[in-house]
Amino acid sequence: MTNLEVDYAIIGAGPTGLYGAYYAGFRGWSTAVIDALPEVGGQITAMYPEKDIFDVAGFPAVRGRVLVEQLKEQADQFSPNYVLGEQASELTAPEGGPVTLTTAQGSTITAKALLITGGIGSFRPRPLPAGSDWEDKGLAFFVPKPDHYANKEVVIVGGGDSALDWAHMLHPIAKRISIVHRRDQFRAHAAMVTQAREMGIDLLTPYEVTALRGEEHLAEVEITSKTDGAVTLLPAQEVIAALGFIANIGPIADWGLDLDKRHIRVNTSMQTNLPGVFAAGDIAVYEGKVPLISIAFGEAALAVNNAAPIINPELGVFPGHSSGESN
């Protein structure tokens, strides 16, 4: 159980939260970063540590875990207080402050301002209906260790970015990669689909996985055509279900924030309807929002700098350039 008083508190230790911690530290503020997960990195650490990310400025490609390591190193210059493995459960944000957070584990964090970077909230993968008895016997929902798939026949189920990203990542080491999608059109970026075809990855559409078969471990996947009902058997030792996630923002829904479904509405300063409370990253929504990690970094900087007059009325929003002095 932890009791902290800081200038700036951040919910979420994913990339957006870590960059927010860096920027708050750059402005000379004490910070606390709270996350329900036991490690920093958010969804990237939990689900995609070996996935390459292509839309971070300055990096043609960067492995997820490497990006998280560098963001943490950047933030740690200013010694943020990490409160990990604890879920923020209650918030009070009176006019004039301070903001007080209480975690489900009994910790209390008091801050002059708060940034919520909770991503999509808590999440669990959408199940593969035909695979309910096959977890740990060949069915997986994430790819934390690509080498596990070396020299194996792999079926990836889904048509989004994750399905194509994993196919591209595993293609050099797997014996064979097949993607099964229940629609003719993929949701993934068209260039990734084209590249998959050119690489020789089998794209099987419109098909649905109707059964997994094997003895102690998966041996084959039954797929059924949605066009004519024809059944095909694919030899496979591994199946990766990339069907998206069921998300829940949890206690945040009860804090009196102006919500749009699972997202928090913010203004152009990234401020919410509650005094001293800001939001950035996937959880924040505004007109024209584009949910990209590169944009989330800018949102975090906006949120931090617009909190400056709350932290100290003598401070301006603009911090000065990073090549000069902070504050």
Language model region names:
Residues 72-103, 108-111, 171-268, 311, ...:
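A Rossmann-like FAD-binding core segment of flavoenzymes
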Residues 38, 150-173:
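Rossmann-like NAD(P)H-binding beta-loop-alpha module
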Residues 11, 25-47, 176-188:
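Glycine-rich FAD pyrophosphate-binding loop
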Residues 127, 132-150, 235-294, 302-309:
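FAD-site-proximal beta/loop scaffold in flavoenzymes
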Residues 14-16, 39, 122, 161-162, ...:
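Residue-level detector of alpha-helix initiation sites
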Residues 6-33, 166-171:
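N-terminal Rossmann-like FAD-binding beta1-loop-alpha1 element of flavoenzymes
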Residues 38-62, 189-197:
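Conserved N-terminal glycine-rich FAD pyrophosphate-binding loop of Rossmann-like flavoproteins
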